[in-house]
Amino acid sequence: FGLVMHQEQNPKNHITIDSIREFRELTEIKIKSKGSGLFMIGGGVPKNFIQDTVICAELLGKEVEMHKYAVQISVADSRDGACSSSTLKEASSWGKVNVTKEQMVFAEATSVLPLIVSDAYHRGEWKNRNRKNFSKIFG
């Protein structure tokens, strides 16, 4: 409601959230990338959008590979409909994620994310990588 009020009070100069543009930009990143993987905290709409970049790219006539891997941290369980019955295994059936490299982490993110990030940092694999600036692809 806050953004609606903001737009009403500032009809000529206001903030707009454009989810279609954002999805198109995510799809452009997927199309231009050599490969991709997903690291998702939680689920819902953002998870669905990022997974669907593969399908959107194909609908635009572009050949793209599935996301090479996916990790999702969530307390949601498909048994009660909390994750819309949309597990990573389901994502592989649509050609979104390579099923051989997917892992659901059923945990509360604030308890396990620091452990995962700390492990990744201390392994040091990032030290020899070139820094990315994805904003350049929108030129």
Task: List PLM regions with ranges.
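Short helix/loop capping segments that flank catalytic or ligand/cofactor-binding pockets
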Residues: 1, 48-50, 81-82
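Gly/Ser/Thr-rich active-site loops/lids in small-molecule metabolic enzymes
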Residues: 11-25, 56-75
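Active-site rim loops that border cofactor/substrate pockets in soluble metabolic enzymes
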Residues: 1-37, 41, 46
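C-terminal functional extensions of proteins
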Residues: 35, 45, 59-139
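An internal, amphipathic alpha-helical element
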Residues: 45-47, 53-55
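Short linear segments in flexible contexts
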Residues: 25-29, 53, 135-138
